[in-house]
């Protein structure tokens, strides 16, 4: 309720604080590491795209529902390529939480002398996670393609932009999976892309209805 009356940057701050508190309940060591990463991402996000805070929050949430592909399609449809930056931050947050979850049991048994090795291990896992670069890269290409097609002076440009974004998303992940052997499940990715494209068409319909009503 509070976030409905505050800037999107406040939404991101509250979401990060909420995550840190939950992580701290499991392991204070992990909470400190998460807080450091969040501070860096938050400063980066505030510097370049503070108005798109909902993108950072939406990607981890939609990833749990297997439809994060909706975000780049919608951002190319209603925003501009600057949303590549907050979408990359959202991808980093999602995979960071996955890595922290994998190290939960290990960190609970650590003594004080093991803090530095623990942080080093988690940080290396985050750096070595090639899926972060792959997903961020594919999302960036999708945003650019959807935005470019949407801006064309032709009929049904928005509809074609959604279809183009969905096709680029599917082939982008297929190529990356064949080339880099990612952890992306192909069947789930294709199904999620189809659902995301359908949701984008629904959002486009309601956007046009609202625009038409406003004109009247």
Regions found by a protein language model. Name each.
Residues 8-13, 27-34, 50-54, 69-72, ...:
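Short, aromatic-rich membrane-interface segments at the entry and exit
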Residues 35-77, 83:
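Hydrophobic alpha-helical segments and helix pairs
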Residues 22-36, 128-137:
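Structural signature of hydrophobic alpha-helical transmembrane segments
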Residues 189-199:
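Small-residue-rich transmembrane alpha-helices that serve as helix-helix interface/gating elements
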Residues 2-3, 40-48, 145-152:
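C-terminal ends of transmembrane helices
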Residues 1-16, 23:
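Hydrophobic transmembrane alpha-helices
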Residues 62, 71-181:
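Generic multipass alpha-helical transmembrane bundles of integral membrane proteins
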Residues 202-216:
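Membrane-interface capping segments at transmembrane-helix boundaries
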């Amino acid at each position: 309720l509070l976030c409905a009356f505050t800037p999107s940057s406040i939404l991101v701050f509250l979401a990060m604080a909420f995550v840190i508190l939950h992580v701290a309940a499991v392991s204070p060591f992990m909470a400190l590491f998460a807080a450091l990463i969040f501070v860096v991402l938050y400063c980066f996000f505030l510097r370049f795209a503070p108005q798109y805070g909902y993108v950072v929050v939406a990607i981890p949430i939609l990833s749990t529902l297997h439809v994060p592909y909706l975000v780049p399609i919608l951002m190319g449809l209603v925003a501009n390529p600057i949303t590549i930056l907050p979408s990359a931050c959202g991808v980093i947050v999602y995979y960071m939480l996955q890595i922290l979850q994998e190290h939960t049991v290990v960190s609970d048994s650590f003594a004080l002398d093991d803090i530095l090795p623990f942080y080093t291990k988690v940080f290396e896992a985050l750096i070595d996670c090639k899926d972060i670069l792959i997903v961020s890269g594919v999302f960036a290409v999708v945003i650019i393609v959807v935005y470019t097609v949407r801006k064309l002076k032709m009929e049904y440009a928005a509809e074609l932009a959604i279809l183009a974004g969905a096709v680029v998303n599917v082939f982008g992940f297929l190529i990356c999976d064949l080339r880099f052997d990612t952890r992306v499940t192909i069947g789930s990715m294709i199904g999620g892309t189809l659902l995301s494209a359908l949701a984008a068409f629904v959002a486009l319909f309601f956007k046009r209805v609202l625009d038409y009503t406003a004109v009247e």
